[in-house]
């Protein structure tokens, strides 16, 4: 049980334990999402990102930094060592296939590592590791990272599905964003 990080020692030609007992930091101030897809996001994702961008004066009461490396493995490593949350949510373009990332060879291995390191990994509506694959190419939404950020995202999705969430709003654009739909 647990997660340990190893680094290749090129001189010795072997991997050396450099990060024993990795634990994802509980508190975070970073999130990673491809903001160019904002116009396609579901309301729970818009709500979460809006709250993060509101900073100290917003409902999350701290300033967040947004990251996007566009490399799933690099993002997973950053979350493991620095904390934070990574979001590749289902959106208007990927809804019919269940998301964009491959469940079996992308989401499942990383979800297992994240949970072993004390974090969470969800689709937005449920735990990644609870999904029984229907086929080898199955796609999924994928949100992982510090539990303190994953849990509100799951709650927002459940509230949205139940019709009990608050509407997305922006002081400048009301229920729209900067990007046109």
Predicted stretch roles:
Residues 1-181:
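IMPase-like, lithium-sensitive Mg2+-dependent phosphomonoesterase catalytic core
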């Amino acid at each position: 049980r647990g997660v340990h990080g190893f680094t290749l020692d090129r001189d010795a030609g072997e991997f050396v334990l450099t990060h024993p007992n990795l634990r994802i930091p509980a508190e975070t101030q970073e999130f990673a999402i491809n903001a160019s897809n904002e116009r396609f996001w579901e309301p729970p994702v818009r709500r979460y990102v809006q709250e993060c961008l509101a900073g100290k004066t917003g409902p999350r009461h701290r300033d967040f930094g947004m990251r996007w490396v566009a490399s799933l493995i690099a993002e997973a490593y950053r979350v493991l060592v620095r904390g934070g949350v990574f979001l590749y949510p289902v959106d208007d373009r990927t809804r019919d296939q269940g998301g964009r990332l491959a469940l079996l060879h992308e989401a499942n291995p990383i979800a297992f590592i994240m949970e072993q390191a004390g974090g969470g990994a969800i689709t937005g509506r449920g735990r990644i590791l609870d999904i029984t694959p229907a086929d080898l190419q199955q796609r999924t939404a994928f949100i992982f990272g510090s539990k303190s950020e994953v849990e509100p995202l799951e709650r927002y999705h459940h509230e949205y599905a139940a019709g009990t969430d608050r509407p997305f709003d922006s002081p400048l654009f009301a229920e729209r964003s900067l990007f046109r739909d």
